[in-house]
């Protein structure tokens, strides 16, 4: 992933200043080019399991439009540790495949592109697997806000519909409006320091909490009347695709330092196929140990 060098923008923060709410009406619908959204996601590392040729291991499910056909599903992991766990399971269940398989960094833009394409042509699909602890943290937040309720052991939305999960992203928001708070930061990239304004959404709640605690100690007035909220990745992408508010272009997804470091270590010598170039790879069918056969555009 050549563009992983640009992750220094988010990984090398020198200092940051939490500012006022950045979006007047979060979720306002108009239009933002898909290309721009994918570009924003292009520097966000996620992880795949690939074979010895660098081709993603996939699995097949019945095509939702034609049960006589198959849909090839690509699996992406938000956490490299979850990818390692899945790889170990494959080594146990299918040693002939797992013995030559490895974990490869990929761009989140590739996963989202496949998901968008699958809406038009479900020949391919995508399964994005979130970190379980982060999903649990998200559920707790949504219960506290009243957006989720638990009835008879089932988690439901406030409208009474089953909660379908997703990949949670945590952000600092204005307590009254719920609008995300922007950050103005001094970032170091290629040995140079510059100022950048962006709206960070974190995959790890505790990572955001540490940032907020540090800001509160230094400038308590900057984070007054704010709180941590959560949005699912698919909802955020849908918002980015449906708004022309210029501040939407300032959205940045912040991976964990561990994930960034893992991806950067691979970027020097890993020639694995980029996911957004892998619409039709000749890859073996993966054992369905991830439970991914429930949909072709799923953000669990």
Feature names for model-found ranges:
Residues 2-300:
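Conserved NAD+-utilizing ADP-ribose enzyme module
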């Amino acid at each position: 992933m050549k563009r992983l060098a640009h992750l220094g923008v988010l990984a090398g923060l020198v200092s940051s200043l939490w500012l006022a709410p950045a979006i007047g009406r979060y979720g306002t619908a108009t239009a933002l080019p898909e290309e721009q959204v994918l570009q924003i996601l292009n520097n966000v590392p996620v992880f795949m399991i690939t074979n010895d040729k660098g081709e993603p291991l996939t699995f097949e499910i019945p095509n939702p439009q034609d049960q006589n056909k198959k849909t090839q599903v690509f699996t992406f992991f938000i956490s490299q540790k979850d990818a390692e766990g899945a790889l170990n399971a494959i080594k146990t269940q299918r040693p002939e495949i797992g013995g030559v398989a490895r974990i490869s960094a990929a761009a989140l833009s590739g996963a989202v592109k496949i998901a968008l394409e699958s809406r038009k042509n479900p020949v391919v699909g995508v399964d994005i697997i979130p970190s379980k602890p982060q999903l649990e943290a998200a559920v707790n937040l949504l219960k506290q806000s009243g957006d989720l309720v638990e009835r008879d052991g089932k988690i439901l939305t406030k409208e009474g519909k089953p909660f379908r999960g997703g990949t949670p992203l945590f952000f600092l928001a204005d307590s009254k409006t719920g609008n995300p708070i922007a950050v103005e930061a001094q970032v170091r990239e290629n040995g140079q320091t510059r100022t950048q304004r962006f709206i960070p959404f974190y995959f790890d709640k505790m990572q955001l909490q540490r940032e907020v605690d540090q800001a509160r100690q230094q400038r308590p007035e900057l984070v007054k009347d704010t709180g941590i909220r959560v949005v699912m990745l698919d909802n955020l992408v849908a918002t980015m695709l449906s708004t022309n508010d210029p501040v939407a272009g300032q959205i940045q997804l912040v991976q964990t330092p561990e994930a960034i470091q893992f991806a950067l270590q691979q970027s020097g010598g890993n020639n694995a196929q980029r996911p957004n170039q892998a619409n039709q790879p000749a890859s073996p069918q993966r054992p369905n140990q991830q439970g991914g056969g429930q949909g072709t555009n799923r953000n669990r």
